[in-house]
């Protein structure tokens, strides 16, 4: 079986689709480029499918490397038979490869190894191969200074047999089947940890079938275990008879050695086999839980990154605070800092009048078009201050026309202390940088959030407990997907944002910014080829994802790739018009038969993509940010009452429900069972991050800081 066929089988694709995708990846094409511009080659695989092919190929390569290591190790021992080589070479199952390797795997000194060193291997094999012979008589021949009596000889032989049974493929697979059907995961409180482990009280005496254990419960138990609060185990629900089933292939009933072998099998099960398979299932279940948690994290991150921007506006950003005051910044349409100051409207200074006067002055001076307020400490109080300006007569500033937004502060402090922020604002402290970040998040969430480690943004589920490498790989792919799905303004994008554009990376991104600083704005995509070290391949990969508003060539501000400009120009010419007219008049495009322009390289999928771009050239798929206001009566958990219906914003979606910001410090939870008047399996079917929702308060636990909400209408 070829690698391509194997991957095609696993992903339910055609061999040709996998072959074409792997060829493009090998040639240096990126996942966004392949899914967008090479649909004819791949049979129109979408980005998820292309990424899945790349991921499966990575796993297969890892297995190939492992198989090579295993073969070399066994061969070095002089024990590699032709049959074993063939079985390992032809296997595509990592578990099977490890089972085949296990008898030859270097180990710490075991009981069986000690017994072999004492010359008891022949006795063990005699018991297995000639069970009708008297074991005690056979054992007498193996007595030495190290093996003083028959009991010691038989014990050593049983140790060897136990290890042999535990390393036998059939034994391991038999027990795996039992675990697969019957395994139960259990957790118990570690004695004396009652107070320290309070947050794990749900798991003090918990058990459930492993196959039904959700990722968040499994990760919670494993975290409690790693913190020394819980003991977690995985075992079949009913272990009676399991050791007998393991022994059956090795024991011949009614023979002299049957009891010895049965005893060895019981030892093999309890001491070696069961712990080994438990470890295996613990690792597998943890990996599956990791994958699910990472999937949810990536999904939340994508929704956050693709949140609607306000766009190019003159924005006032406010990072609120009490004692240290509120840092205020004013930005121009490009997000450049024009001014910064600090006001003290809250405790302890309570200089509200001066603060209001400063805001009025800045709004007029910098022609402010929107206000972004951080949603952290003093956020609601600062929002109330700014909204109060609407009721004050002021001929110079019409506050009714200035929308006010509460913006998530998650990760802002991480950004403000980062090297990226220091490079952008070397002469300003972290408070100014934080306020700028809040304002820029409103203007363009994607462009600002890519500067922050996704793990600091606050939409993960047990993110510190999952595989760090797998998490980084998934989140990097998510950021790359979002950046390329939206497209990037070549003349305003930061180096950090450009880094995620298909085919670029950090070095070329910085070269683009340096070129722009030296030569001014790019007039065309073609000018990219003048950027140092940006060659034809990089241009091919990145050009379609970079936009130039007001470019001389109208397609330079669309997702149409430069390699297809000539085709679109020919369509215009054949229709008796020019390119600008073709784009401006859909009725002309409607008369064009796309099938006339199909070739081996350009089929209907690509032509339909081009047509969709011409319908809305330069369109931002994210829409525009909408104003939202929390309930004015609610400022803390103490203001909540059962039955209250409140506006809220979804901040995090998990497998067990959605967390909702009510404009107070404590987030409320809408449990999955309360998301709708119907059964909901996956909360993501109903809600997503940044969604504005209406919720009803069903329970308030002030002592534990928990708020239960419902979105049910009935």
Feature-to-residue mapping (PLM):
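Structured, non-catalytic alpha/beta "coupling" segments that mediate domain-domain communication
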Residues: 73, 87, 98-101, 224-239, ...
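Single-stranded RNA-binding regions, centering on S1/OB-family and related RNA-binding modules
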Residues: 548-552, 556-714
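Duplex nucleic acid-engaging cores and interfaces of nucleic-acid transaction enzymes
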Residues: 49-52, 59, 63-317, 323-428, ...
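Long, highly charged, low-complexity intrinsically disordered interaction regions
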Residues: 3, 61-79, 89, 414, ...
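Short, ordered loop/turn segments at secondary-structure junctions
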Residues: 37-39, 128, 237, 320, ...
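Generic start-of-chain signal for non-secretory N-termini
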Residues: 1-19, 26
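A glycine-rich phosphate-binding loop feature that marks nucleotide/adenosyl-phosphate handling sites
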Residues: 177-184, 318-322, 376-378, 407-414, ...
């Amino acid at each position: 079986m070829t690698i391509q066929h194997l991957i095609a089988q696993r992903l339910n694709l055609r061999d040709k689709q996998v072959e074409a995708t792997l060829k493009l990846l090998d040639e240096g094409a990126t996942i966004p480029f392949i899914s967008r511009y090479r649909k004819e080659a791949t049979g129109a695989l979408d980005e998820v499918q292309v990424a899945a092919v790349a991921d499966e190929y990575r796993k297969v390569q890892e297995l190939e490397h492992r198989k090579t290591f295993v073969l070399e190790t066994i061969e070095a021992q002089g024990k590699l038979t032709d049959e074993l080589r063939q079985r390992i070479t032809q296997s595509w199952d990592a578990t099977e490869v490890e089972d085949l390797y296990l008898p030859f795997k270097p180990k710490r000194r075991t009981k069986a190894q000690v017994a072999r060193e004492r010359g008891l291997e022949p006795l063990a094999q005699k018991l297995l191969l000639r069970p009708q012979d008297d074991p005690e008589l056979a054992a007498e021949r193996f007595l030495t200074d190290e093996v003083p009596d028959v009991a010691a000889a038989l014990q050593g032989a049983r140790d060897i047999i136990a290890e042999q049974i535990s390393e036998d493929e059939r034994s391991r697979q038999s027990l795996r089947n039992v675990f697969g059907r019957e395994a139960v995961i259990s957790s118990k409180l570690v004695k004396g940890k009652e107070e320290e482990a309070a947050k794990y009280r749900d798991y003090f005496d918990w058990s459930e079938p492993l196959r039904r254990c959700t990722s968040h419960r499994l990760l919670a138990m494993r975290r409690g275990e790693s913190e020394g609060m819980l003991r977690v185990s995985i075992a079949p629900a009913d272990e009676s008879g399991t050791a007998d089933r393991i022994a059956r292939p090795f024991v011949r009933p009614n023979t002299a050695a049957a009891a010895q072998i049965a005893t060895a099998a019981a030892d093999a099960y309890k001491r070696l086999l069961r712990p080994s398979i438990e470890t295996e299932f613990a690792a597998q279940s943890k990996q599956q839980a990791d994958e699910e948690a990472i999937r949810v994290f990536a999904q939340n991150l994508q929704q956050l990154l693709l949140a609607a921007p306000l766009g190019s506006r003159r924005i006032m950003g406010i990072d609120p605070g009490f004692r240290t005051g509120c840092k205020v910044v004013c930005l121009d349409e490009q997000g450049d800092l024009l001014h910064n100051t600090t006001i003290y409207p809250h405790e302890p200074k309570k200089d509200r009048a001066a603060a209001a006067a400063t805001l009025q002055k800045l709004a007029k001076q910098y022609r402010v078009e929107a206000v972004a307020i951080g949603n952290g400490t003093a956020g609601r109080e600062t929002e109330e201050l700014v909204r109060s300006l609407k009721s004050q007569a002021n001929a110079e500033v019409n506050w009714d026309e200035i929308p006010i937004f509460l913006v998530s502060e998650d990760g802002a402090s991480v950004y403000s202390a980062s090297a990226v922020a220091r490079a952008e604002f070397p002469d300003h402290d972290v408070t100014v940088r934080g306020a700028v970040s809040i304002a820029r998040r409103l203007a363009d969430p994607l462009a600002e959030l890519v500067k922050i480690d996704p793990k600091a943004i606050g939409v993960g589920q047990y993110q510190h407990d999952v595989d760090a490498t797998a998490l980084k790989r998934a989140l990097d792919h998510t950021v790359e997907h979002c950046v390329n799905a939206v497209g990037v303004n070549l003349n305003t994008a930061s180096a950090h944002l450009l880094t995620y554009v298909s085919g670029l990376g950090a070095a070329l991104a910085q070269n683009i910014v340096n070129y722009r600083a030296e030569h001014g704005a790019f007039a065309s995509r073609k000018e990219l080829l003048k950027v140092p070290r940006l060659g034809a391949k990089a241009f091919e990969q990145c050009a379609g994802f970079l936009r130039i508003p007001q470019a001389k060539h109208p397609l330079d501000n669309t997702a149409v790739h430069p390699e297809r400009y000539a085709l679109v120009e020919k369509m215009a010419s054949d229709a008796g018009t020019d390119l600008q007219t073709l784009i401006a008049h859909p009725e002309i495009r409607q008369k064009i038969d796309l099938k006339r322009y199909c070739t081996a390289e350009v089929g209907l999928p690509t032509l339909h993509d081009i047509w969709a771009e011409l319908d809305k050239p330069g369109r931002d798929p994210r829409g525009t940010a909408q104003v939202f206001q929390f309930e004015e009566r609610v400022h803390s958990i103490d203001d909540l009452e059962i039955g209250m219906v409140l506006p809220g914003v979804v901040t995090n979606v998990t497998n067990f429900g959605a967390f909702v910001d009510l404009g107070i410090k404590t987030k409320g939870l809408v449990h999955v069972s309360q998301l709708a008047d119907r059964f909901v399996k996956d909360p993501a079917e109903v809600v997503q991050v940044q969604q504005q929702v209406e919720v009803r308060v069903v329970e308030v636990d002030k002592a534990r800081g928990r708020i239960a909400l419902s979105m049910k209408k009935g």
